[in-house]
Structures are given as structure tokens and as C-alpha cells.
């Protein structure tokens, strides 16, 4: 109900906008004949009178030709057409009777993105295209276009909606897979042929146009209805709603995360800090660490060597080191007995009687220090040492470092006989003359290392280390030698590649019969593997089920080889790669579509009126057929009813729409068969009996350009049945059994879809907006919409036919 209201509203809002004037905006128009600049010098075509005199018309002759847009012209076409879902193909034509040819073709390599074809052999118009899932599709419209008469044809494509008008009459309207116009570079545009060798259109074409606009058929038939928006317009509205829903869901999720973060941020003050030796410093804060000036920048400590000042000291003071500081500062001095002492320094003086007196520099004066007595020593007098700064002797080997010293980080205290001194650790150098502060020596930068060739020097605190270059292994702490990755099996070569050791590395080369860069080698099969086969070894193909042969070129006929046993009411029909059981004439499927044909049941021809009994007979239904019986006592004519007309008993006639089939009436039954071909008869109809055509000009070249077929030969190519008829190749889709199920899938390398019960496995998505999904955030999602599951980064969900289908993207996980 909601979808119908939405559509009516959309028609009211946008319907009037679709009623344009009959003039076409040139930016939306591709006038093919004008842009290709066809003329008298163009081989294979010539200008002739058309349906009207307003534009030029050209006769496409049965001669070799190459009507192909130049690269620049084709790209101009594709710039207007690329990634558009609303366009119309228009053409006025007069096609030669029985000709099968391509009107226009847009293809890249073997991929037909858009090709319009008319088959006079089978009396049908075909549209070949690729869908958004990159699968090839063919829509067949039964219609006699190749009748040597003028026709106006328009094919309007609007998203998944096709409308075919012929002579301003709507002939067909279908819902299909949405065609893709994501045309890659190198795509080609052909007119009147598929390529240089195939699909030659024979006849006259006029007014060949592509209109990239809604309801483009109006340009050809102005009186047609155009008051309501197109399917693409409606799909666009639905898409916008889905996009808005997705934006709303993402915005709500972002808002929820932002609120959570704000709640956490309200509880704390976040600032980048630095921590050094147990002390935390704020951003941009600077401090002195020994002889380094350090700063906290963006949470990282950056230090530089401190540059000490050299101040002028006042009278009775001089520069001296101060405990805990790197640079010298002005310090008071004392002059005593011709020597200079700094504040706090002590000195002993011995009298002539040997009495020791201790002095200390205080307030620029040497003052007497009272003696507090000395501890008893436990060493002989010969091992006792007299000190210059104390009246108390110590034993030899006394630990002066245990008392007090000024040796900082990376400097160690060493005991001398009468005092302690500082010494830099190995690998460090002094920052001042007393060795109290030291810094690391970068042996690598200064060339003071022993690393040899094939190594790289890496500085470490107080030392260095030599690491091996890539492709080398260690001999000792300073040397490395070449590493043969091939012998040690430490290479990345493919199992089908040969490893060759090189200096510092190795090379990988694919073995004969394989191709690739060495790290990845794939088997190479000279003739290729057809029908989905995989090349698994040099010139060895692994064929999919249903095919055999060196190149998987031969279809296995399951029907004739006895692999299949169909029900007695069904015939086995072989298809490329597989088969199916099709109900015999007189039977139809009951809707269960049993694979073996058990679901075939009798058709009551009498009850349904599908019989040929004349009015003077009575129809009796039989299993798989019927009987025309004459009532007792009456003299029946044995006439037949065919296509609403009376055919007399014994009468023979040719079908109106199939000149190659002959029918006869025999006692109320109509029996039809193909014409018997007598190749000895000089008047034999070569159209019906192509096998009787010996002319070389009637032969056909296979699409691969290698195989030559005689007229009448048939073959299968890319899920199409192809036939050579008097030099023309005509291909049509292989018949597939009906798939009466909600969900279907087209397996890879197969031609016909199969039913599946899991909607997430289905290939196609029905664009029914009434089938919605409710996601994990309680947001309504339309069929076809996709989203990233809330709380995840790599789980992609999609609404398919009202079901939520989710999968994890492996590439996304690798990028995290």
C-alpha cells in the first residue's frame, strides 16, 4: 500500500516534468549516422532514398565492410552513455527478407555490453547485454522484422524495465536484470555488424540514434503516452530514500559514539605528557637532565647537549662545579698558604710536633675545624694513609665512593689511594673534565666500529651492533656471508617455478609450461580450456562436470550415453554441461518440476480445446494424446481444425510462419514435420535444406576465427545455439527449463539457472520495495540496499528479497 501511494505521489510531482517538447537536447542525443560520417567513399554502404527525405538513409550491402566508430568518436558516445540507466535506441530500417544481422553493437573484447540484433531466420529481435553482476544476458522478442518492409523500432531501457515499440505500437514490456553501462576503456562501437566478419545487417537504415533521456521513444512517436515517470525515475527515488536511510543510520551511529566519547572526556583532562626517571612533564615543558636540555614535544622527549655559559665572577670568587649541576657557577674562594680553596673545601696543616690542624674555607676565610676524634684503625701503620682533607687516617683500600661522589648517569665512581674520581663507562665520552657527566659515542656515525662488508652498523647505548643485510646470514658478531635461499628453501618461489640464487637474494622463474612472475605461476594450455575448464598443468585441462576432451571442447551427451533415466512421460534433453528431462508432447509439468520428469502429467486436450477434431467428431482424451471418434451411425469427414480454419482430410499445407514445415490432416489429426530434403532436386529450397548448399560463399567462420562450417551446421558457443545458414551465422539462447521458484542461481560455467532455498545465495534481487528488512539499529532497509553492520568495520549486510544477508570482507580485514 505504501509503495503504491509513493508511486502516485511521485507521478504527481514529476509527471509533468517528463512531458518535454519534442525537440531533443543535443547533449542527450547520439546521432550515429551523422557522427560516423558515412558517405560514398565508405566501403559496403551507399546512400539511398529513405522512408522520408528529412535525413540520410544508407543501404548496407552484402560486401566486406567495417562500419566502426573511431576511438575518439566512440569515446564521445560512451561519455554520454557511460553509467546511465535511462536511454533509448531508435532506428528506422528496412531489413532484407530472411537476413540475420546486428543493428548496432557496443562490446569490449568478447563482452557484449549492448547489442541489438534482428534474426530473419528465427523471426525475432534480440537484445544482448551485461548486467551489473557482469553476467551476459539475452532478451528475445519474437517478431518478424526482416520482411523487406519499412519499420520504426525503439527500445527504451529504464533501469530494469524494457519497452519495445515497433511502428509506434508497444510490442513488449519486460522487467529484466538492470543492464550495465560501466563501459571500460577500449570498448568499440559497430553499426550494421558485430565485427569485421560476423553479424552483417543487410538492408537500409535511417535515423539511428541513442537518446540518453527518459521516454526517448517520444522523439520517434510523439503521440505515445508519456505522462508518468519511468522505472528509472522511480528506482532513483527509491535509491535516494535508501541513501538517506543509510546516511541517517550512519549519522545516528556516529552520534552515539560521539556521545560516549564526550561522556568519557568529561571525566578526565587529556594532555600529552612525558615521563623521565619517574617524573612527569607536561607538553612543551623543558628541564635540565644532567648536561642535557630536554623538552616534552607531542609526548616525546627530545634532548640536546647543554651549552654552558661563561660568566664573569665577582672579586674573591671563581668558576667551579656545583653538586647536581652540569655547568660551573661562581663560587667563593679562600687564599691560604699560597693556594686557592673553594667554599667548603678543607685542608690539613701539620705542626713541627706532628699535630694535625684542619681548616675549611667559609665565607672567603679559612677557619679552624674542631677535631671530634678519629676512629680506631684495624690495619698496621704501614698500611695507613694520610689524607689532605682530613686529620683522620684511613686504611689502604678505603672505599671513598661509599661516602659521597658526584658521578652521574653513564659515569662510574673509582677509588684511588686517597680520594674518589669519576670515569665514563665504556662507549661513552666525558662532557666535562671531571668525567662526572658522560654521553653515548655513536660509533657508527664516527666510523669507530668493526662492522665488515655485508653488514649494517646500528648504534646502541655504549656500544654498537652489526646486523646482516637482506639475503645474508651471520658468521660472527662483525661478519655476514651470502645466504642461499634456494638451498635452504627460504624463498618465495611458486611450486611450479625454479629458484636461482643471486647476490643478496634470489630469482624465481616459472617452469616450462607455466606462466607468471615466478612467485605465482599458472599452468599454460596452448589451446586454452573451454567451457569453464581450468588449466592445471602444462597443456592439461581439468574439465567441469558435463564436458570432456583435451580442451574441454566436447559436451558429454548424458542422454545418449545412458547416464540419465528420465520418466516415461519425459524426454531427455541434452544441454552443454548438463541435461534436463522435458515433458513429452501431450504432457505438462504439474508445478513440482521433478528432475527426472516424474512431475509430468497428461494434458486433457479435449477439456482445454487443444485438439484438431472437426465438429462432426467427438474428442476423447488419452494418456499423452487424444482421439477423434466418429459417433456411432454417423459418416464423419475426418476433417481437422488448424489455427481456426478447417483443413480437409488428406489436405497438405505449408505453415504460414514456417515455410520449412509441412502439415497434413489425417482422420481428424494434424501432423506436422520438417520438409524432406532431396539434395538431388535442383529446385530444393536451400533455406529449409541448407545441407544441400555446396557453395563456398555459404560457409561460415566460427567466432574464434579458426573453424569453418558448412551451411546447415550447428554448434554451441557461450550458452548459445549457433547455426550457419547461407553464409550467415545466427545464434540464439539455449532453451532452459522453467524455474518456478522464488530464489534461483546461475552456477558458474553453466547456462541455465537452478532453484535454491537460501535467499542469500540467489543471484538476482527482486526490486520489490514492499519486501523490506529491519537492521540491527531498527532501521528499515529496502530490497537491494547494503550497509556496514553496526559495531563492525568489515561486515557488509544486504537486504535481499526481504532477508538480511551478511558476509565479512576478507580484503577489509587485511587492511585493518
UniProtKB/Swiss-Prot annotation:
PROSITE patterns reported for this sequence: ASX_HYDROXYL, EGF_1, EGF_2, EGF_3, EGF_CA, VWFC_1, VWFC_2
Pfam families, alphabetized: EGF_3, EGF_CA, Laminin_G_2, VWC
MF (Gene Ontology): calcium ion binding; heparin binding; identical protein binding; protein kinase C binding
Disulphides: 401-413, 407-422, 424-438, 444-457, 451-466, 468-480, 486-499, 493-508, 510-521, 525-535, 529-541, 543-552, 559-572, 566-581, 583-600, 606-619, 613-628, 630-636
Residues of the VWFC domain: 272-331, 638-693, 698-756
Segment forming the signal sequence: 1-21
Domain Laminin G-like: 64-228
Residues that carry a glycan: 53, 225, 293, 298, 517, 548, 615, 635
SUPFAM superfamilies reported in the protein's UniProt record: Concanavalin A-like lectins/glucanases, EGF/Laminin, FnI-like domain, Growth factor receptor domain
UniProt GO cellular component terms: cytoplasm; extracellular region; extracellular space
Keywords: Calcium, Disulfide bond, EGF-like domain, Glycoprotein, Neurogenesis, Repeat, Secreted, Signal
Localization in the cell: Secreted
GO aspect biological process, one term: neuron cellular homeostasis
Ranges where the EGF-like domain occurs: 397-439, 440-481, 482-522, 523-553, 555-601, 602-637
Residues that bind Ca(2+): 440-441, 443, 459-460, 463, 555-556, 558, 574-575, 578, 602-603, 605, 621-622, 625
Gene3D superfamilies: 2.60.120.200, 6.20.200.20, Complement Module, domain 1 (2.10.70.10), Laminin (2.10.25.10)
Keyword Calcium included in the entry's annotation: yes
Result of altering residue 509 to A: Diminished binding to ROBO3
Function: Plays multiple roles in neural tissues, regulates neuronal proliferation, survival, differentiation, polarization, as well as axon guidance and synaptic functions. Plays an important role in axon development during neuronal differentiation through the MAPK intracellular signaling pathway. Via binding to its receptor ROBO3, plays a role in axon guidance, functioning as a repulsive axon guidance cue that contributes to commissural axon guidance to the midline. Required for neuron survival through the modulation of MAPK signaling pathways too. Epididymal-secreted protein that signals through a ROS1-pathway to regulate the epididymal initial segment (IS) maturation, sperm maturation and male fertility.
Subunit composition and interactions: Homotrimer. Binds to PRKCB. Interacts with NICOL1; this interaction triggers epididymal differentiation. Interacts (via the EGF domains) with ROBO3 (via Fibronectin type-III 1 domain) with a 3:3 stoichiometry; this interaction promotes oligomerization of ROBO3 resulting in the repulsion of commissural axons in the midline.
Protein name: Protein kinase C-binding protein NELL2
